[in-house]
Amino acid sequence: MKTLQKDLTTGNPGKIIFNFTLPIFIGNVFQQFYSMADTIIVGKFVGTKALAAVGSTGTIMFLINGFILGMTAGFTVLTAQKFGAGDMKAMRKTVGNAAILAIIMSLIMTVLGMMAMKPLLGIMKTPDDIFKDAYAYIMVICGGIAAQMLYNFLSSVLRALGNSKVPLYFLILAALLNIVLDMVFIIAFHMGAAGAAWATVISQGISGILCLVYIVKAVPILHLHKEDWRPSGHLLKIQLAVGIPMALQYSITAIGTMMVQTALNLLGSTQVAAFTAANKIEQIVTQAYVAMGTTMATYCAQNIGAGKIKRIRQGFKSITIMGSIYSVVVAAIIMTVGKYMTYLFLSGDLTEIMHSVDIYLKCVGTFFIPLTVVNVYRNGIQGMGYGLLPMMAGVAELVGRGVVAMIAAGQKSYFGVCMASPAAWILASALLIVMYYYVIHQNEKRFAKYADEG
């Protein structure tokens, strides 16, 4: 069988980065279909208030998903570094230890999440007319955290080895299954918002199981031995030192988005529904930035393991150009015709809602280039083994998003709510560019010293 694992330390950086990013982007878009299918079917067949209920939990969903994504990606940075260095024995050991951490964290997150949801929705001032549906939806999601952890961990392991295609295949299948289950649970069984959550959890679980079956059947270098499951204090310390800051970084961002959601909730369920629809449109086009970030984490991890700092510089240059071109194109599209996608989510007279959707898309589309920098540089720095520095950029995001959200809440300004994320991107991108040059300079000196000693 032809191996799908890929060494990212050789070949043309731009071409390799593009080829690795494309399947991740497609996979991320299909993953968005999980929530988009929920949004469309809930909005069309249950109603505006049910759509607002699902949308009002979006920031909590981001907190859960982001924490899992950041943590599993961080746990497997060391895996990519060992793979890049050609040390397969050490690579397997990192996978075994990361799996132990993932299991423990999924249990902790499930218990804490289910305990915290009701008070958290209250703190966020979720409107009374959508509270019941919002609570039902998010509790099912919390109960399915293990399913999310399974897929994200195994896909992170495969990507650490340069395989971005297989997670895509299983994700596409799961996304299609999610749509079918949405129709069954919501339309046929009339389960409402909770039915949408069940469809999402079941689909994610199946995607994770398929990844596991693939690894067992087709990736012999990931067949773990008994000794690989033995906890190593040294490895666990390194993995936690990268994984926890990456997870917390998403959490910090999520706290900022919760502040935005709180400000939005003060404007009523109609504006919440408009913001939800617009945010879904934004999330589809911005998955390219998430994919670029995922690519750079693996690319930088493998190349730092191989000691190729110049190649890392070349990679950053190539992907920054790609991201900037993409930003200009998609911004032009969503700022002109994006509002018409509102018809995907809602029916009836949408004049007021479409106007609000248009405001949101124009606000965020104007600042897509800073968003490119945030995703690419943050993940690349993390891939080189730095956990705390990118987290500081997350704090900058929190400050930018939080300050604007508080001002918007005080003035009950929808435009202010829409400008919260752009403010966060501008602050974080400026800080990350400075961090990038610092990290590159430090590693150039480090590897030059090793060369001199050799």
Q: Model-derived features: where do they sit?
A:
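N-terminal transmembrane alpha-helices
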Residues: 8-46, 59-74, 78, 103-110, ...
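Hydrophobic transmembrane alpha-helices of multi-pass small-molecule transporters
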Residues: 63-66, 110, 178-182, 208-212, ...
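Small-residue-rich hydrophobic transmembrane alpha-helices
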Residues: 51-111, 148-167, 274-338, 371-393
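Short alpha-helical transmembrane segments in multi-pass integral membrane proteins
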Residues: 1-21, 79-144, 188-244, 300-367, ...
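Transmembrane helical elements of multi-pass membrane transporters/channels
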Residues: 19-38, 140, 151, 174, ...
